[in-house]
Amino acid sequence: MKRLEKMEVSEKRIKVSEKRSPKIFLSGSIRGGRQLLGTYRFMFDTLEEAGAEVLSWHVADPELEKTEMRMTEEEIYARDMGLLLKSDALIAEVTVPSTGVGYEICRALVQRIPVLCLYSPDASVSAMVLGNPDHLLDARAYPDKASLKKIITEFILAL
């Protein structure tokens, strides 16, 4: 009997110590403008440092346009929606208005996936984001990269 008890305790320790990396869908403007590519890359790096697995790494890829030129609209949609459905959370940079980012946010909320929207304090962010009462959506302004890193890290650790 004692051996069985030890085995159960040891299995519990393994489960606690094997906390898996959260899977994150990173969302940012692509066709709406790539002027924040450096910010997307910073967000990607911050997520990896925090122990997250970024499923939509292509958002931070400077060669994305070349890659997506070889894909149909349907292939891009299927890839992105497939990755979103595998995600534990969505983190979106919403400073640059983007129909695609808005669509991804909405789909995540419909699927009950937590969403963190980040934006520059001087951005004109849609009321559909800032006024959304869904408790799974958190919208936060970041004045600098240190604040951006802190907000992302705290969000990941809370998942």
UniProtKB/Swiss-Prot annotation:
The keyword Hydrolase applies. SUPFAM superfamilies: N-(deoxy)ribosyltransferase-like (SSF52309). Its EC number is 3.2.2.-. One of its GO terms (biological process) is nucleoside metabolic process. Substrate binds at residues 25-31, 40, 58, 104, 126-128. The keyword Hydrolase applies. Gene3D superfamilies: 3.40.50.450. Keywords: Glycosidase, Hydrolase, Nucleotide metabolism. InterPro entries: 2'-dNMP_N-hydrolase, DNPH1, Nucleoside_deoxyribTrfase. It catalyses: a pyrimidine 2'-deoxyribonucleoside 5'-phosphate + H2O = a pyrimidine nucleobase + 2-deoxy-D-ribose 5-phosphate; a purine 2'-deoxyribonucleoside 5'-phosphate + H2O = a purine nucleobase + 2-deoxy-D-ribose 5-phosphate. It holds the Pfam family Nuc_deoxyrib_tr. It comes from the Archaea. One of its GO terms (molecular function) is 5-hydroxymethyl-dUMP N-hydrolase activity. PANTHER family: 2'-DEOXYNUCLEOSIDE 5'-PHOSPHATE N-HYDROLASE 1 (PTHR15364:SF0). Monomer and homodimer. HAMAP family: Nuc_phosphate_hydrolase. Belongs to the 2'-deoxynucleoside 5'-phosphate N-hydrolase 1 family. Catalyzes the cleavage of the N-glycosidic bond of deoxyribonucleoside 5'-monophosphates to yield deoxyribose 5-phosphate and a purine or pyrimidine base. This is Putative 2'-deoxynucleoside 5'-phosphate N-hydrolase 1.
